[in-house]
């Protein structure tokens, strides 16, 4: 059985949060930089290229920018990076 990832998702991306939960991932809402710690990757809107400092080294995993992507495309990005 595959271990599911801990994914930080910006709070405005509720459709992405729901889809990732349905896939079995642990979803953490990103309200501050501290929320990103311990996440395998983070999904941000991309409206602010450095949302709360997450684009810097505050997380060990990938930062996925959801701008221009469908919910399914974001989920595929998460799967390929975790």
From Swiss-Prot:
InterPro entries (UniProt xref): UPF0180
Superkingdom of source: Bacteria
Family, similarity comment: Belongs to the UPF0180 family.
Record protein name field: UPF0180 protein BCE33L1278
């Amino acid at each position: 059985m595959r271990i599911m990832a801990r994914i930080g998702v910006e709070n405005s991306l509720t459709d992405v949060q729901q889809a990732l939960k349905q896939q079995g991932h642990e979803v953490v809402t990103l309200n501050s930089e501290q929320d990103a710690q311990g996440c395998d990757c983070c999904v941000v809107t991309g409206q602010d290229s450095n949302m709360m400092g997450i684009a810097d080294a505050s997380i060990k995993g990938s930062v996925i920018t959801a701008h221009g992507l469908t919910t399914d495309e974001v989920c595929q990005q998460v799967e390929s990076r975790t």
